[in-house]
Amino acid sequence: MKLSDPKLFRQQNYINGAWEAADSGETIDVTNPATGEKLGTVPKAATAETRRAIEAANAAWPAWRAKTAKERAAILRKWFELMMANQDDLGVLMTAEQGKPLAEAKGEVAYAASFIEWFAEEGKRIYGDTIPQHGADKRIVVIKEPVGVVATITPWNFPAAMINAKPVHHLPLAARL
């Protein structure tokens, strides 16, 4: 597998601003499904690493919440731009670890990036709403605000598009980029 920018190929967990191995040092092999060739490894993270990641995200939360919608949008926009600038390499990586045709993998990168772009733009348009009340002496107002650190488990058919996808030991590299 040849990437134009080899720095994109990461084989560690990203926790609290740093790339690190699993505490145990154990890894899981990632192979090309077409050839069986080993592409690399990913850390076999456990409870301690998960807790550190959650704690780091919670510690970063107040600073993120304090940013204006425009500032948050600029960060998300930069992420979108980086994905699109590296679309070819990300497509090569997905093709190697999933067996998808290269054109489909590159399309998935653009599809994944489009979600980030959408949230960057919509985040600037978050307004509170007034909802019709059931009584003359009531006013119901909706205030939209960040709520905190969340996690989700989603299907793994589109690893770049489903950034929070559940880990599967055959396809973890594309979601780390």
What name fits each language-model region?
Residues 13, 21, 95, 124, ...:
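Short glycine- and Lys/Arg-enriched binding-loop motifs that mark or flank ligand-binding interfaces
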Residues 17, 36, 72, 116, ...:
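Residue-level signature of catalytic and energy-coupling elements of molecular machines
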Residues 129-177:
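Conserved small-residue-rich beta-alpha loop and adjacent elements
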Residues 1-34:
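Hydrophobic face of amphipathic alpha-helices that form TPR/SEL1-like repeat modules
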Residues 32, 44, 144:
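Conserved strand-loop elements at the edges of beta-sheets that form or border functional pockets
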Residues 39-127, 136-137:
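Glycine-rich loop-to-alpha-helix module at the N-terminal edge of alpha/beta enzyme cores
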